Amino acid sequence: MNIRITGHARGLGRSLYEHFKSLGHNVEGYSLSTGYDINTVEGRKQILDGLDQVDVFVNNAWSEYSGQTKLLEEVIQVWDGNKDKKILNISSKACYNYNDVNIDLAVSYTHLTLPTIYS
């Protein structure tokens, strides 16, 4: 399965990235620290490039502006109702201040989303 994750460099995004990699999936990560800014048109274009080859899009990158919402809208437009594609949209400021306790708890619940992703 081809999975693309924004905000993959730390926190929940990093844990999801590593988890899906460990399951043998092809996982691509996009983060501000690796040069992809969801708040810019160019950054979103880079993330959307080749999206037709992706099965699951994890919209996890945090944005002070409307970048995450704009990116979600653009992914929906590119996929144009393709029901074989899956979007996991993560939006919680609680994840911004993670620590060893709450990140482990969050990752332990990822199995709850897997049936949706793999359906």
Which role fits each region the language model picked out?
Residues 29-46, 70:
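Adenosine-cofactor binding site in Rossmann-like domains, unifying the SAM/SAH pocket
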Residues 2-5, 57-58:
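Conserved hydrophobic beta-strands of the Rossmann-like cofactor-binding core
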Residues 6-18:
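N-terminal Rossmann NAD(P)H-binding glycine-rich loop of SDR-like oxidoreductase domains
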Residues 111-119:
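Single conserved hydrophobic/aromatic residue that forms the stacking wall/gate
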Residues 80, 86-112:
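Catalytic loop of short-chain dehydrogenase/reductase
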Residues 63-87:
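NAD(P)-cofactor binding segment of oxidoreductase domains
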Residues 58-66, 91-92:
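Conserved NAD(P)H cofactor-binding loop of Rossmann-fold oxidoreductase domains
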Residues 42-52, 73-77:
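Conserved amphipathic alpha-helix within the SDR
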